Amino acid sequence: MRKRFFGLLLTAAMVACTMPMTVMAADGDSQDFKDENLVVGVWGGTIEEVLRKNVVDPMEEEYGCNIDLVLGGTSERKAKMYAEVDNPSMDVLFLNIYESAQAIADGVAQDVDPSLSNFDSLYDFAQTGGYGMSIMGLGIVYNDELVTDPITSWKDLWRDDLKGKVALSTFPSFEDDAFVDITAQAWGLDLKTQEDEVFDKIAELGSFPLFYSDLDELFLEMKQGTVKAAVMFNSYSNDYVEQGFPVKFVYPSDPGAVLAKDTIVIAKNTKHEALAKEFVNRCLSVETQTAYAEDIYFSLCNKNVKVDDETASKLVYGDDVDSLVSLDWTYILEHESEWTDKYNKLIEGN
């Protein structure tokens, strides 16, 4: 009986080898992805490298499909998604925490599909407004050789020893949008009724040595002491710590570090929905999420991922995830244009 059973298995395997590559897609349906072309809009650099190694190359080899990565920032691909809603040139798009939720609400992106096999492994915050790919904590990075009194709270940025030494990013950006809200919360101001007072408080930081858009430039200025502290993400900061820069990242209190989430959405009218969902499901896997953590220090959305203590120290991990502050991005985006004018005045008066 065992010989006959083995013979049946061998026959089945031989037949399978002569048939097109057919796989069980993320939604549970059998799919043939051979020669399909999936277009994914995503950031470049280390993110591209991790995705190619852990998702793109394995899928292309296994399924016989082709996956094109269109590199760039979120503003360009978001604009294309809205303009091309009826015939999207990109099937999958990586966006930030507020862009993805808005795209779903506006009907240009699909809502999440809970049937994906890795969906239930995501933290709750990663299951809404798009598929959560990674999270970061927005906090403070500072030169710990020049700043001898440790920074522990957001209000510490207003200390006399840091006056005129705090850098902000160019506006608009996630960092600056969030910093407006955080300034209000830290100083007990009502952002909705005391907006001018909030910007007056930001101006009290003194002359700004740098409005950064280039991280290499920022950390060089920090090394030289022109900048002593900056509003920054944990993952980027820890990358420069690894490179030997004399800096330290902290999750400041009052009210806490800000939750930043990179998300994935699928275009509403994609012609490759099953392949797109398979791509997303692979991105959410333990293997890919582990690579995000270990290779580029992006914190995890899959709660089943385990990393060593050294890696964990560089991430928002475990109980720290619950401590991140979520902001009212709907309100922030509604007022971003007027905030831009106020930021420009800060720069002009710099």
Where are these regions (language model features)?
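Short, low-complexity disordered leader/linker segments with a strong preference
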Residues: 1-38, 349-350
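Early extracytoplasmic/lumenal segment of secretory-pathway proteins
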Residues: 28-102
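Extracytoplasmic ligand-binding site segments that recognize negatively charged/polar headgroups
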Residues: 41-52, 89-226
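Mature extracytoplasmic/periplasmic domains
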Residues: 267-324
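Conserved C-terminal helix/tail region of periplasmic/extracytoplasmic solute-binding proteins
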Residues: 323-350
